[in-house]
């Protein structure tokens, strides 16, 4: 069934700037996985599994391919189309006590509402490079947020 999802969409010209690590980049000496870092929340399936965090935001995908990272619990389920931040995702960032947020769609940009609303230190994967720990200033997050464009995305759910 098709559903209209209100979102803030990432313009194409923003994609390059946000693909650059937005914090401290950690790379393992052998270019393998990085383990054991601490942050308030992790965005991404592999990162969520390998680091110590209070909250996990996952979508059962890595590099756009479905992955099985073991049994997962979902305190909150959100719908978030690729390249967007849905209003549903913003609402989920306000929920206290949630330890696991499962995303139908893509979780990549959800770093933004969780750092803005909760001031979280976030850890996320930098594909084929390493792991980034980010705790940007509120001003930096608001600047990124202002660049997103309101839109409606039709998603088959």
Curated annotation (Swiss-Prot):
GO biological process, alphabetically ordered: coenzyme A biosynthetic process
Which residues make up the binding site for GTP? 40, 59, 61, 107, 128
EC assignment: the record states 2.7.1.237
Kindly indicate whether the keyword rRNA processing belongs to this entry: no
Molecular function as annotated in GO? GTP binding; kinase activity
Q: Which reaction does it catalyse?
A: 3'-dephospho-CoA + GTP = GDP + CoA + H(+)
Q: Which Pfam families match?
A: DUF359 (PF04019)
The pathway this protein participates in, as annotated, is:
Cofactor biosynthesis; coenzyme A biosynthesis
Database matches in InterPro entries: GTP-dep_dephospho-CoA_kin
Alphabetically sorted, this entry's keywords are:
Coenzyme A biosynthesis, GTP-binding, Kinase, Nucleotide-binding, Transferase
PANTHER family referenced in this protein's UniProt entry, alphabetically: GTP-DEPENDENT DEPHOSPHO-COA KINASE, UPF0218 PROTEIN TK1697
Tell me the protein family, please: Belongs to the GTP-dependent DPCK family.
Q: What does this protein do?
A: Catalyzes the GTP-dependent phosphorylation of the 3'-hydroxyl group of dephosphocoenzyme A to form coenzyme A (CoA).
Q: What is this protein called?
A: GTP-dependent dephospho-CoA kinase
Supply the source organism for this entry.
Desulfurococcus amylolyticus (strain DSM 18924 / JCM 16383 / VKM B-2413 / 1221n) (Desulfurococcus kamchatkensis)
């Amino acid at each position: 069934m098709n559903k209209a999802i209100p979102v803030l969409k990432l313009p194409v010209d923003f994609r390059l700037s946000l693909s650059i690590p937005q914090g401290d980049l950690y790379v393992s000496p052998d270019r393998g996985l990085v383990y054991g870092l601490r942050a308030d929340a992790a965005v991404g399936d592999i990162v969520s599994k390998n680091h110590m965090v209070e909250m996990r935001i996952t979508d059962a995908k890595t590099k756009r391919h479905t992955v099985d990272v073991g049994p997962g619990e979902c305190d909150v389920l959100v719908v978030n189309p690729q390249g967007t931040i849905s209003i549903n995702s913003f609402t989920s960032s306000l929920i206290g006590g949630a330890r696991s947020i499962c995303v139908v769609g893509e979780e990549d940009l959800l770093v933004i509402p969780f750092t803005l609303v909760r001031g979280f230190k976030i850890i996320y994967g930098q594909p084929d490079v390493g792991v980034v720990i980010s705790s940007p200033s509120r001003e930096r997050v608001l600047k990124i947020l202002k660049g997103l464009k309101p839109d409606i995305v039709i998603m088959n759910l």
